[in-house]
A protein has these predicted regions:
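Non-catalytic, glycine-rich low-complexity segments
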Residues: 20-62, 68-70, 110-117, 126, ...
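Aromatic- and carboxylate-lined catalytic core of secreted/periplasmic carbohydrate-active enzymes
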Residues: 23-27, 42-47, 359-362, 372-509, ...
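Short tyrosine-centred short linear motifs in exposed loops/low-complexity segments
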Residues: 28-31, 76-78, 82-100, 476-480, ...
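Active-site mouth of glycoside hydrolases
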Residues: 53, 116, 122-335
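Surface-exposed loop/edge segments in extracytoplasmic proteins
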Residues: 62-69, 502-510
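Extended acidic/polar, glycine-enriched regions
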Residues: 66-133
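Catalytic-core region of carbohydrate-active enzymes that cleave or remodel glycosidic bonds
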Residues: 319-403
Length: 540
């Protein structure tokens, strides 16, 4: 197993205010660091963040200032995890609600932060993702465009997705170019345990501590390997009996414990599901979104996972805390490009991501989600404005171990295990999607739904007249005279066919030339789906 890279995690134990050494600590930009303290006495309820509020104020180069929440980690041990956002010298001072608790309050220190590592993009550019200045995509912490290619492991972390399985999933998907995993694990981590996330901020006991320290190992592994987690808890209607205070208690602890990691938050799966229950829980969900945004010291991009598009009323879309829109096209159907265009054309744009569409292996009498369906769903979303795509697979999304114990997956078609879902061809073929888009400046591309005349089942995305990507759906029939319109007369383009199944490319030897502001569309190599990449050549 590859050695974990978070060697910059600092562990300093303070039994009293005189425990400081004279030398500055060492850390790395964009890597998780941790400070460890020992309280002078037991805290009755360490999850009560109003009466036991532990934090540190960090001051860094160029006036940087971060207030980072801390967390209880067993007995009298408390920690603060922090990701330095710039190289140079940082100073910090701790705060605790009870200023008389000198083991936790008023501790000061210095950290010398070295430039970032380059072993993974997350360590090089920072995994606390932000919204781009034009509100069309997400960026790494340093502003570098972030390409979202995600997989769905809703059951992680839990007994359905034990740590060794999680590691296999991370390793396979990273090798295929994936950058994100989505999960809403809230269940116990073994069959013998009774504590999951919702129970894990109620009592400061050994079972609770064991739960959190096991979850640590999941997120530490993903961070070390270079994969972003997009995380929530359960499903919206399951929050009905839980008070907003208890939800805030859970999220305050979660943010303190994992906020320094390269993670995003989707709050829950399907935050606005079930209209007959919605009024009982939806106001809590929206208020919780603002609480998460206000508590997160890094103000990272925040979203909420919605119900299927045909039933999604977009209640969170205009909330000030919602930074990007997560879309759910749903299953066993193809979403129309116009549905994505509507989101793209919002008066006050927010980036949007297709977060759940056609899990591979789902099947019905008239619709089989195979690799071709996966490609069509993914390329349609990106060509229509989504800044990425999240894949999902039967069995894998729910952590199925045994065909005889399928859980809810039996409703969606033939039962698969997580390992069978991980090996499906559509998931592997999406590595080529990322290669395709990263072969150009993908973040400069915009959907062009009216670029063709007459219209055809070819989706166009373009950077003005400089670079154009044309996705031909399978079995497309080009009408006579179909062309790209409104291009510079006489302009020549290098033209390349990109095969979404293999990643192979074939250049058109004569390229394409605009005549009378029209560029005739070439026919695809065969009846399967293809991407045509056009790159402007020199001066016309």
């Amino acid at each position: 197993m590859k050695r974990l890279h978070w060697i910059w995690l600092l562990s300093l134990v303070f039994a009293n205010p005189d425990g400081w050494g004279a030398d500055a600590l060492q850390a790395r930009q964009w890597c998780v660091s941790a400070l460890t303290y020992t309280a002078n006495r037991d805290v009755a309820d360490p999850f009560d963040f109003e009466r036991a509020d532990f934090s540190a104020i960090f001051h860094g180069p160029a006036g940087a200032e971060w207030k980072v929440p801390g967390f209880w980690d067993g007995g009298r041990t408390w920690r603060i995890r922090f990701t330095p956002t710039a190289p140079g010298r940082w100073h910090y001072e701790t705060r605790f609600s009870d200023a008389g608790e000198k083991g936790l309050h008023g501790q000061v220190g210095t950290i010398d932060v070295q430039p970032p590592l380059t072993d993974t993009p997350l360590h090089q550019h920072g995994g606390l993702l932000q919204v781009s200045s034009n509100h069309r995509y997400l960026t790494y912490s340093d502003g570098t465009p972030f390409f979202w290619l995600g997989d769905t492991w809703w059951a992680a972390p839990s007994a359905n997705v034990p740590l060794d399985v999680f590691k296999q999933q991370v390793d396979v998907r990273l090798a295929q170019g994936y950058t994100v995993f989505q999960m809403h694990g809230h269940r116990p981590l073994t069959d013998s345990e009774t504590i999951g996330a919702f129970e894990a901020t109620r009592h400061a006991d050994a079972a609770t501590l064991r739960y959190w320290q096991q979850v640590d190992r999941y997120l530490a592994y993903a961070e070390a390997r270079g994969m972003v987690g997009c995380i929530g808890f359960a499903r919206g209607d399951m929050f009905d009996p839980i008070s907003l205070t208890d939800l805030q208690r859970l999220w305050r602890y979660y943010l303190a414990r994992y906020g320094a990691y390269p993670v995003l938050f989707l709050i829950t799966q399907e935050y606005n599901i079930e209209p007959d229950k919605r009024q009982q829980y939806l106001p809590k969900m929206l208020a919780l979104g603002q609480f998460i945004k206000d508590t997160d010291p890094y103000r990272r991009a925040l979203t909420a996972h919605p119900w299927a598009r045909s039933r999604d009323l977009g209640q969170a879309w205009n909330e000030p805390w919602l930074d990007f829109i997560m879309f759910q096209a749903g299953h066993r159907r193809f979403e129309k490009p116009s549905a994505y265009h509507e989101v793209w054309q919002q008066p006050s744009p927010k980036p949007f991501i297709e977060g759940e569409a056609n899990y591979e292996g789902f099947a019905a009498t008239n619709f089989n989600v195979n690799a071709a369906a996966i490609r069509r769903s993914a390329y349609t979303a990106l060509q229509s404005g989504s800044f990425g795509f999240t894949y999902g697979a039967q069995g894998l999304y729910a952590g199925v171990f045994d065909h005889a114990k399928p859980g809810p997956t039996f409703r969606w078609g033939p039962v698969l295990t997580w390992k069978e879902g991980l090996a499906l061809p559509g998931g592997a073929q999406l590595q080529h999607l990322r290669v395709c888009y990263e072969s150009v400046d993908w973040w400069k591309l915009e959907p062009r739904p009216k670029a063709l005349e007459p219209s055809a089942d070819v989706l166009v995305k373009a950077d003005g007249a400089a670079t154009l990507l044309l996705y031909y759906v399978s079995k497309v029939k080009l009408p006579p005279g179909c062309h790209l319109k409104d291009l510079p007369d006489g302009q020549a383009y290098a033209a390349t066919w990109f095969d979404p199944r293999t990643g192979g490319t074939t250049k058109l030897p004569d390229g394409c030339v605009v005549k009378t502001e029209k560029l005739p569309l070439p026919a695809p190599p065969d009846t399967q789906d293809w991407m045509l990449i056009l790159r402007k050549l020199g001066s016309k």
